């Protein structure tokens, strides 16, 4: 005859714990963040996606500005490097077309976020320094800029902006 005492005991314990697990809930964790350094690499296939890419920035910055962290500009360092089609959103002549996106970038620039544009892409698009918004800094190359800041200890975040096929309500 087989000894089934241990498996039976384990099954009984699992079944006894199941109702408690159903009524359990998630817990909030307050990770003790200290002086975060983030580098956003933005390279989009369509300028209309810039708004969605900025939600990645919001998801990083806003929780750090609010309690319990309440960081100030000098408590964190955030750099955004633009080098794709989104470059047109920071051209002064396109401000009316991308007004909401520009206002959001201007807000974050006021919070200490640095917005940098690839100088090579700037030339490729036929823009000059005077064509750019005042909060923009132009770097020699996005690639060298990204490597430089990663070598300084910045964490790289590359927003992935896909086409939205379903509303939140449809998939909830």
What residues fall within each predicted segment?
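Bacterial N-terminal signal peptides
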Residues: 8-18
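Sec/Tat signal peptide C-region and signal peptidase I cleavage site
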Residues: 20-24
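Acidic/histidine-rich, surface-exposed loop or edge segments in extracytoplasmic proteins
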Residues: 32-45, 82-87
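Acidic helix-start/capping segments at beta-turn-to-alpha-helix junctions
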Residues: 71-90
């Amino acid at each position: 005859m087989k000894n089934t005492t241990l498996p039976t005991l384990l099954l009984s314990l699992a079944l006894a714990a199941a109702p408690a697990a159903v009524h359990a809930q998630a817990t909030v964790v307050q990770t003790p963040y200290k002086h975060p350094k983030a580098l956003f690499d933005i390279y989009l296939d369509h300028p209309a996606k810039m708004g969605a890419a900025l939600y990645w920035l919001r998801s990083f910055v806003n929780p750090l500005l609010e309690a319990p962290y309440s960081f100030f500009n000098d408590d964190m360092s955030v750099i955004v490097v633009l080098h794709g089609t989104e470059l047109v959103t920071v051209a002064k002549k396109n401000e009316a077309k991308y007004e909401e996106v520009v206002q959001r970038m201007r807000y974050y620039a006021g919070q200490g976020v640095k917005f940098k544009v690839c100088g090579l892409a700037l030339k490729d698009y036929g823009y000059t320094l005077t064509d750019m918004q005042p909060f923009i800094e132009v770097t020699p190359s996005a690639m060298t800029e990204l490597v430089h800041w990663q070598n300084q200890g910045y964490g790289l975040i590359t927003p992935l902006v896909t086409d939205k096929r379903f509303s939140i309500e449809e998939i909830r």
